[in-house]
Amino acid sequence: MKFTYYISSIFLLLAICGFTTSCDVHQFPEKHPFVLHLKYDTELPLYKIIEYDPATRSELSNSYDIRYTVNIYRQNTKTNSDPLYQYVFTKDDISQLNNTITLHLIKGNYRFVVWTDYVNQNSQNDLIYDTYSFNNICLINSEYVGATDLKDCYEGIIESEVSNTIREAVINMQRPVGKYKFISTDIEEFKSKIIATKGINNNTNRSAENIVNLSDYKVYFRYNGYFPTNYNILTSKPIDSKAGIYYISDIRQLNDSEVELGFDYAFVNGTESTLSISFEIHDAENNIIAHSSPINVPIVRGKQTIVKSKFLTSDMSGGVAIIPDYDGEFNFIVK
């Protein structure tokens, strides 16, 4: 397993000047080893299954590393202050996020702020999130990307003294994002519909899989209204959003009856927020073969919402009614 790190020399030099009482290069304060234990709950609990019933970690490839960015501030400083120290570590074993990091710090009281995300293998450069400032973590300014687990990320903050007796701390890392996923439950009906439309004899020896190629179809997901794009780790809140965001997803077979239409991650303000989402399904000739009206999807920090329906064979229209007296998962019905 590869494990590398980088120390920001600018912040390190500033920190030394800040803690010394003079510029006497012969008198540097003694540094003490301090161990940060980063613990991650990588499970993404199911929050709600939203079922539309008119009748009644995709796995990441080995070409990515985990990046740990550790900013260290004076305790009780303003949230817009620059860090005293910055450490950047990477690890190539993305199956295990838990990590132990040893730092060398001068005695004092600190706030440790950690951000964890994915980067390209053997690189520490930003991939999905621009992390130049922890006051303004934002999506990289390029074409918006959805339907990728590379957008999964974690944050953690702890305040601790560093001294002869206090030499370690545990940070429980949490996701600042929630995830949603759209699943269509009518893939067999969809294939039969396409075969009938093409006028293909069902008695041929060709299977439905050979006749209907799911790679010919794309799903355009659109956010109606504003989508949160910028996040402040020090306050744990989204701070900006943009309108007109959409992304394109492939259709992925899950089992004999279900396909995944698409999914995404979003920064959450507080514990729960709502996104208005609509989508169109296009065929190889870019014809729209199915579409939805705006659907209000609850997004919960650190959890996953699954939206299920027969999206491939029926247009969704009308409003969404919530069944009020239901203990547990919520069922949404499109009228």
Show the residue positions of the predicted features.
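Sec-dependent bacterial lipoprotein signal peptides
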Residues: 1-24
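Bacterial Sec-dependent N-terminal signal peptides
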Residues: 17-47, 182, 302, 320-335
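Short amphipathic, basic-aromatic surface patches that mediate peripheral association
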Residues: 31-61, 184-207
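Tryptophan-paired
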Residues: 60-126, 192-299, 332-335
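Structured interaction patches on ligand/partner-binding surfaces of diverse proteins
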Residues: 91-95, 119-168, 247, 285-314
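Short strand-edge motifs at loop-to-beta-strand transitions and within beta-strands
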Residues: 99-101, 167-171
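Conserved "repeat-terminator" motif of extracellular CCP/Sushi domains
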Residues: 170-178, 264-270
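Exposed, polar/acidic Ser/Thr-rich sequence context and nearby capping/turn residues
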Residues: 172, 184-188, 269-273, 278-328
